[in-house]
Amino acid sequence: MTKQNAFTREDLLRCSRGELFGPGNAQLPAPNMLMVDRITLISEEGGKYGKGELVAELDINPDLWFFACHFEGDPVMPGCLGLDAMWQLVGFFLGWQGLPGRGRALGSGEVKFFGQVLPTAKKVTYNIHIKRVLKGKLNLAIADGSVTVDGREIYTAEGLRVGVFTSTDNF
């Protein structure tokens, strides 16, 4: 059976409700913390390392919640939301691969910010390159990612780490 290789906003909302990968498995956050409108490509091959990739998008409009509070009179999307979106996508990749458990961001290596998302922007694109997936007692993905706004790269992150856990009692 061929896996679905693109996901709509409605698919992602189903994932946030726990309906895409099954109860107790990887979920995306619900709006307003869901930082992705669509996944245009997800693959177990390809990417910079040949081990998988995701491309996803967020449509920008001036009414998005964070522009009203970050910062008053100087609206900009918080960089941490772009970083969180990359973690969201790495976790989604694990669920899409059928690995059981709830996703948790476990850290990252170097993160660089060298641009910003303003209310005048049209589209943010996330590119995730899977470096490694560990399967076993701990299911973990390690990836590098980048964020572009209207075609210009503005953030990069190396060593994004996300695990899925069948129990988070001791986490």
Swiss-Prot record:
It catalyses: a (3R)-hydroxyacyl-[ACP] = a (2E)-enoyl-[ACP] + H2O; (3R)-hydroxydecanoyl-[ACP] = (2E)-decenoyl-[ACP] + H2O; (2E)-decenoyl-[ACP] = (3Z)-decenoyl-[ACP]. It is found in: Cytoplasm. Pfam families: FabA (PF07977). GO terms for molecular function: (3R)-hydroxyacyl-[acyl-carrier-protein] dehydratase activity; trans-2-decenoyl-acyl-carrier-protein isomerase activity. Its EC number is 4.2.1.59, 5.3.3.14. Pathway: Lipid metabolism; fatty acid biosynthesis. Gene3D superfamilies: Hotdog Thioesterase (3.10.129.10). GO terms for cellular component: cytoplasm. The keyword Lipid metabolism applies. The active site is at 70. The keyword Nucleotide-binding does not apply. One of its GO terms (biological process) is unsaturated fatty acid biosynthetic process. InterPro entries: FabA (IPR010083), FabA_FabZ (IPR013114), HotDog_dom_sf (IPR029069). Keywords: Cytoplasm, Fatty acid biosynthesis, Fatty acid metabolism, Isomerase, Lipid biosynthesis, Lipid metabolism, Lyase. Its main location: cytoplasm. Belongs to the thioester dehydratase family. FabA subfamily. Necessary for the introduction of cis unsaturation into fatty acids. Catalyzes the dehydration of (3R)-3-hydroxydecanoyl-ACP to E-(2)-decenoyl-ACP and then its isomerization to Z-(3)-decenoyl-ACP. Can catalyze the dehydratase reaction for beta-hydroxyacyl-ACPs with saturated chain lengths up to 16:0, being most active on intermediate chain length. Homodimer. NCBIfam families: fabA, PRK05174.1. This is 3-hydroxydecanoyl-[acyl-carrier-protein] dehydratase. It comes from Pseudomonas fluorescens (strain Pf0-1). The gene is fabA.
